[in-house]
């Protein structure tokens, strides 16, 4: 039984840490990555989130120069809530193909749509950063402000 719990924990760590893989033949068009955290000091709890989105252009197949472009859009949104008694993790990954170039989406819109307990109102405001190139890992979380949060740097 203890070994089964360890395997579940290892799978959870792998799932949390591995990014969505890109096709090496695709050309990077757009990318965005955002990270942040909120501390609820009165509850000794915290929420962290990570969001990445990338859009690539698939190469035109040989002999089909008149075909419409095909965009591959990959999105990954993760949240983790930690308190002395609770650990909750959530992850959503979306992969889509389209003939129109998708818009980059801010993480805040996803974070605001994440269900919360009645006693956990959303009071933080995200100050996002955008990247024009491929997603890069940031060692610093973005700054958040709000009544129940503390600025992080």
Curated annotation (Swiss-Prot):
Disordered, as annotated region: 1-24, 121-153
Keyword flag Cytoplasm: no
GO terms (BP aspect): transport of virus in host, cell to cell
Compositional bias per record (Polar residues), positions renumbered to this chain: 121-138
Record's signal peptide: none
Coiled coil: none
Domain of life: Viruses
InterPro entries: Luteo_VPG
Pfam families: Luteo_Vpg (PF01659)
UniProt entry keywords in alphabetical sequence: Transport, Viral movement protein
Family: Belongs to the luteoviruses movement protein family.
Function (record text): Transports viral genome to neighboring plant cells directly through plasmosdesmata, without any budding. The movement protein allows efficient cell to cell propagation, by bypassing the host cell wall barrier.
Name recorded for this polypeptide: Movement protein
Organism: Barley yellow dwarf virus (isolate P-PAV)
């Amino acid at each position: 039984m203890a070994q089964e719990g360890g395997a579940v924990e290892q799978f959870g760590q792998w799932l949390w840490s591995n990014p969505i893989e890109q096709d090496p033949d695709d050309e990077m068009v757009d990318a965005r990555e955002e990270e942040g955290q909120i501390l609820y000091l009165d509850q000794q709890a915290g929420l962290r989130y990570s969001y990445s989105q990338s859009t690539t252009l698939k190469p035109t197949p040989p002999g089909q120069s008149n075909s419409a472009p095909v965009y591959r859009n990959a999105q990954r949104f993760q949240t983790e809530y930690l308190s002395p008694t609770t650990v909750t993790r959530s992850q959503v990954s979306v992969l889509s193909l389209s003939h129109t170039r998708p818009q980059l989406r801010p993480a805040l819109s996803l974070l605001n749509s994440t269900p919360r307990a009645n006693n956990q109102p959303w009071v933080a405001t995200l100050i996002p950063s955008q990247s024009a190139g491929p997603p890069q890992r940031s060692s610093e979380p973005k700054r958040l402000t709000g009544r129940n949060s503390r600025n992080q740097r």
